[in-house]
């Protein structure tokens, strides 16, 4: 066998020459190295390669450059090289071509030494396009911004110590002058240098593509990932953010002693108004937080930015009633029209017992594309009208939150001053959910004072003036004299500090976005972490936004009643006869209601998806053929009653839902509560879902409930009326609280305590008390174990049937001997009533 060192195994001369040339290329170190050194390296390499492969033979040294070039293993495996990130194949290929770190390829190392830079092409810009003016330095150090933090601080204006201005004092406050369309000289409430710097930073983005700016903004804002979570939009999370920061003063207002003003067990609703706030994110949050214990009224401009109630996935939009001013649901919703302001005010007061709402939210804004620096001036009337609406519908002690923009002009600051006078406390606040690069901030007002009517009427007159001056060269430039504003030094100082603070914040945020546009590798590393912290702090579940899936009524019914015996729902009431009359001997335990038709169970799956069932297992749930809406997960015991209004040819008939009892209200199971409490909750629920602005919808009412010992009150409401289609024969009719009447079919009698408890009257204490027949215990307060839950009330109820044989008046047909008369029942009740006649 031939050895590798034999002459026959050596490379041919041609191959040796080729290797020599390769050695010359690989050994070259720089473009400036003399040719003699290259030749010397080539000679040494050739000599070495033309001899033996043995490491010990000849001891002829190779050129260092050539040797390094072919140390593929060290190049591939060395971790110290900045090229170690590349795989071994690419490194070997480069090594074979003679690559050495820090030098270029080529005979004289004339190749480029640095890696080819990534493309600086931005978005869809033309190849090589540079935006003149944008790429210049802003000379703003944005890197010293504070660390992102979920905890926020609130700085309130000092409490206003001056009296609320009256109409006489404000009579000459309004100043009309030449319309002003520049902002650069508005330096009364902000330093000139800061103002101009901010305007410059804003203007830089005028030439930038919007999509490019949005991408950079998304990467630059540490709070960007909060987004809308499972709500309709980001606005909902702004409200959640502010609600937490201000100690839930919107969704859980407190009284003067610091206790909750409203409890879920109370009969009072939390009323709110949402103006200029389509598509309704603020309202969706409030209704999600308070569920059916809140009722909202809304007015916004009709059109593409109207309320999107069908997109309220996390809350029941049935609890919200849009009203568009003059014309109601057919109005235009323009808040600058005085007629709309008055109409909305009257509507809200009529439906809140003339008290007004607990708080108003306003989030108005419109596109100012191309005129971003003039946003404050262009939005001045909108801002005024939102403030005016709040003073028109907020109840005494109520709250107000409204979006504002820059507040540099004396006009805007004057409006803030009027709020400062009308509310107990006021502050300007920018939540972390509001992007730092925009001029958006919120004025938050707490505790409306008494005696603000003159201010409201003054703002109303200013709005009329603004409407008259529209499309002219004149404008209202002042609503409060500068001397008055600056005369209140604490207010003036706060205003300047606030403006300059937000101005500095905005400048840094704009500079940061500018840097992120120029360097697309920059990003905020803590976005996900900050999002998690904020959601936990604000008590918002971290779940995706998903549209509610359609439900099968039977499946939903079993889901709501849980493990309750289905047979309970098929029980029929015990008829009240002479034989069963003894059951109502403990009269203090019973309540009664007038019936108008057959009892049914009604299931609400959201909107108009409403089904009824008569309680028999053999029957199915049937879609209700009425125009009404109910929140999902609602289960009621009802009657569908034909109500009548008027008599004769003008008589009108409408089908109404009458609630006898409630089981589940918008997911809240109330079956274990006392019957009286369930009826109170039913009345509260009906207030929340009623739509006074929609006369085309079938009404929902709660039965009037009477104490059994006061049953004679029912008969006061009974009279003979002519019913259209009855052949001219008067029929017995029961007139309800709303002046509508119906033909009664009988009276339901419901027991409110459960065995072995009963109710009695203490003559010594002159009080009712609860008595346990087994243990002999007695209490003046209601023992929880004595409460009759829904299923007990349902299967123990009695029904006093009135038919054609029922005798109440002499004008009616003769009495049926098998039926109890009015005198029979009333005399029995009176004889067993411990309270006396």
Swiss-Prot record:
Chain intervals for the UniProt region annotation (Interaction with POLR2A): 726-834
One Pfam family cited in the UniProt record for this chain: FtsJ
N6-acetyllysine, modified sites: 107
Domain of life of the organism encoding this protein: Eukaryota
Cellular component aspect of the GO annotation: cytoplasm; nucleus
Residues in RrmJ-type SAM-dependent 2'-O-MTase domain copies: 230-449
Localization of this protein: Nucleus
Enzyme class: transferase
Domain WW: 751-785
Residues binding substrate: 202-206, 217, 373-375, 438
Biased composition (Polar residues): 36-53
Region (Disordered): 1-67
Keywords: Acetylation, Methyltransferase, mRNA capping, mRNA processing, Nucleus, Phosphoprotein, S-adenosyl-L-methionine, Transferase
Chemical reaction(s) catalysed: a 5'-end (N(7)-methyl 5'-triphosphoguanosine)-ribonucleoside in mRNA + S-adenosyl-L-methionine = a 5'-end (N(7)-methyl 5'-triphosphoguanosine)-(2'-O-methyl-ribonucleoside) in mRNA + S-adenosyl-L-homocysteine + H(+)
One of the GO BP terms on file: 7-methylguanosine mRNA capping
G-patch domain segment(s): 86-132
Keyword Oxidoreductase: no
Active site: 238, 363, 403
Role description: S-adenosyl-L-methionine-dependent methyltransferase that mediates mRNA cap1 2'-O-ribose methylation to the 5'-cap structure of mRNAs. Methylates the ribose of the first nucleotide of a m(7)GpppG-capped mRNA and small nuclear RNA (snRNA) to produce m(7)GpppRm (cap1). Displays a preference for cap0 transcripts. Cap1 modification is linked to higher levels of translation. May be involved in the interferon response pathway.
Assembly mode: Interacts with POLR2A (via C-terminus).
Protein name: Cap-specific mRNA (nucleoside-2'-O-)-methyltransferase 1
Organism: Rattus norvegicus
């Amino acid at each position: 066998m031939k050895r590798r060192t034999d002459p026959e195994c050596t490379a041919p001369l041609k191959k040796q020459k080729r290797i020599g040339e390769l050695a010359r290329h690989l050994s070259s170190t720089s473009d400036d190295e003399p040719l003699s050194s290259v030749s010397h390296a080539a000679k040494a390499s050739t000599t070495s390669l033309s001899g033996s492969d043995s490491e010990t033979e000849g001891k002829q040294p190779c050129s260092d450059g050539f040797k390094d070039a072919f140390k593929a293993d060290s190049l591939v495996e060395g971790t110290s090289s900045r090229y170690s990130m590349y795989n071994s194949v690419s490194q070997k290929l480069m090594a074979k071509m003679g690559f050495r770190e820090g030098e270029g390829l080529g005979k004289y190392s004339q190749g480029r030494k640095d890696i080819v830079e990534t493309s600086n092409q931005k978005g869809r810009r033309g190849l090589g396009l540079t935006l003149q003016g944008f790429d210049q330095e802003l000379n703003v150090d944005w890197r010293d911004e504070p660390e992102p933090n979920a905890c926020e601080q609130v700085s309130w204006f000092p409490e206003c110590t001056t009296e609320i201005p009256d109409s006489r004092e404000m009579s000459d406050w309004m100043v009309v002058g030449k319309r002003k369309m520049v902002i650069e000289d508005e330096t009364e409430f902000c330093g000139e240098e800061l103002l101009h710097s901010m305007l410059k930073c804003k203007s830089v983005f005028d030439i930038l593509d919007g999509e490019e700016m949005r991408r950079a903004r998304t990467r630059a804002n540490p709070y960007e990932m909060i987004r809308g979570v499972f709500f309709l939009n980001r606005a909902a999370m702004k409200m959640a953010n502010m609600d937490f920061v201000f100690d839930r003063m919107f969704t859980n207002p407190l009284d003067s002693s610091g206790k909750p003003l409203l409890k879920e067990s109370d009969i009072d609703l939390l009323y709110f108004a949402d103006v200029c706030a389509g598509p309704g994110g603020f309202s969706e949050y409030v209704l999600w937080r308070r569920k059916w214990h809140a009722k909202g009224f809304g007015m916004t401009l009709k059109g593409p930015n109207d309320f999107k109630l069908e997109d309220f996935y996390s809350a029941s939009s049935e609890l919200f009633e849009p009203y568009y001013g003059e014309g109601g649901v057919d109005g235009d919703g323009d808040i600058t029209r005085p007629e709309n302001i008055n109409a909305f005010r009257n509507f809200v007061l009529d439906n809140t017992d003339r008290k007004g709402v607990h708080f108003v939210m306003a989030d108005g804004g419109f596109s100012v594309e191309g005129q971003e620096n003039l946003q404050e001036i262009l939005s001045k009337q909108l801002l005024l009208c939102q403030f005016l609406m709040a003073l028109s519908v907020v109840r005494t002690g109520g709250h107000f939150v409204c979006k504002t923009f820059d507040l540099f002009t004396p006009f805007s600051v004057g409006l803030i001053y009027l709020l400062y006078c009308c509310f107990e406390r006021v502050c300007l606040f920018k939540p972390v959910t509001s992007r730092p690069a925009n001029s958006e901030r919120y004025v938050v007002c707490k505790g409306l004072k008494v005696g603000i009517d003159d201010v409201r009427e003054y703002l109303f007159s200013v709005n009329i003036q603004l409407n008259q001056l529209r499309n002219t060269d004149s404008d209202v430039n002042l609503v409060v004299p500068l001397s008055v504003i600056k005369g209140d030094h604490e207010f003036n100082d706060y205003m300047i500090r606030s403006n300059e603070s937000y101005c500095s914040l905005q400048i840094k945020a704009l500079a940061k976005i500018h840097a992120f546009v120029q360097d697309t590798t920059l990003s905020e590393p803590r976005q996900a972490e900050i999002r998690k912290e904020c959601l936990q702090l604000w008590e918002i579940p971290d779940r995706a936004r998903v549209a509610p899936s359609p439900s099968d009524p039977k499946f939903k019914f079993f889901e709501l009643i849980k493990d309750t015996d289905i047979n309970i729902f098929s029980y029929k009431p015990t008829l009240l006869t002479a034989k069963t009359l003894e059951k109502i001997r403990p009269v203090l335990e019973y309540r009664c209601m007038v019936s108008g038709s057959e009892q049914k169970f009604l299931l609400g799956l959201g909107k108009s998806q409403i089904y009824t069932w008569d309680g028999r297992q053999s029957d199915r749930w049937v879609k209700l053929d009425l125009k009404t809406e109910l929140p999902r997960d609602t289960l009621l015991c009802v009657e569908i009653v034909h109500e009548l209004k008027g008599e004769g040819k003008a008589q009108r008939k409408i089908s109404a839902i009458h609630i006898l009892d409630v089981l589940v209200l918008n997911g809240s199971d109330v079956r274990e509560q006392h019957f009286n409490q369930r009826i109170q909750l039913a009345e509260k629920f009906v207030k929340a879902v009623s739509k006074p602005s929609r006369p085309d919808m079938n009404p929902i009412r709660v039965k009037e409930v009477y104490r059994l010992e006061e049953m004679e009150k029912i008969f006061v409401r009974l009279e003979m009326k002519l019913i259209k289609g009855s052949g001219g024969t008067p029929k017995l009719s029961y007139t309800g609280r709303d002046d509508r009447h119906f033909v009664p079919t009988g009276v339901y009698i419901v027991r409110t305590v459960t065995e072995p408890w009963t109710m009695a009257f203490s003559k010594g204490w002159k009080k009712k008390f609860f008595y346990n027949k087994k243990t002999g215990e007695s209490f003046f307060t209601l023992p929880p174990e004595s409460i009759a839950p829904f299923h007990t009330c349902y299967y123990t109820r009695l029904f006093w049937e009135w038919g054609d044989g029922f005798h109440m008046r002499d004008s009616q047909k003769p009495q049926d001997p098998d039926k109890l008369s009015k005198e029979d029942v009333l005399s029995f009740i009176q004889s067993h009533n411990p309270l006396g006649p």
